[in-house]
Amino acid sequence: MSLVFVISPPRAGSTLLQRMMGAHSEVFTHPEPHLISPIAHLGVYGNVDKAPYDHINAAEAIKAFIDDLPNKQQDYLDALRAYTDTMYGRMLSTSSSSLFLDKTPANALVLPFLQRLYPDAKYVVLTRHPLAVFSSYANSFFNGDWQAAHEFNPILERYVPAMARFIRERPVPL
């Protein structure tokens, strides 16, 4: 199974790109599966702001557990990859395609984790002027109320630095 991740903020044209690429017989895609960002926030690679359990205790316990694994971080990444490979693979098995495309915008917020989990995947980075992204977001979901849109999701502060760092550092071929 081959994976392609479209890295993009919301409202940057990723759905159109997904539909265009998904029209190819070898590419299968599913609307924003959100498989990566939740496992990136188990407390090992990123902090959890809110959870219905003691996320601080859970993060520390998971880190201690990982430290006792024979191959430590590598065993943990292998287990997480087994989960996502299974999920992507099962979805891919419903088609005759050989490539799965994931365009979940939240993946842009966990890029160091994603590239560690899938260093051999293909990454397509889609950019759009940040103010055009935010304007589209505010107009599409908040009737043009930029303040309400920003309070709900500060897209500019979240996506621009994360994507800029990824493009600048190029940890994987783009």
Predicted regions and their residues:
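ATP-binding Walker
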Residues: 12
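PAPS-dependent sulfation machinery
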Residues: 28-110, 117
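PAPS-dependent sulfotransferase catalytic domain
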Residues: 91-174
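Pre-Walker A (Motif I) flank of P-loop NTPase domains
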Residues: 1-3
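A conserved segment at the C-terminal end of the G1
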Residues: 15-27
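Hydrophobic anchor at the beta1->P-loop junction of P-loop NTPases
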Residues: 6
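P-loop (Walker A) phosphate-binding loop of NTP-binding proteins
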Residues: 9
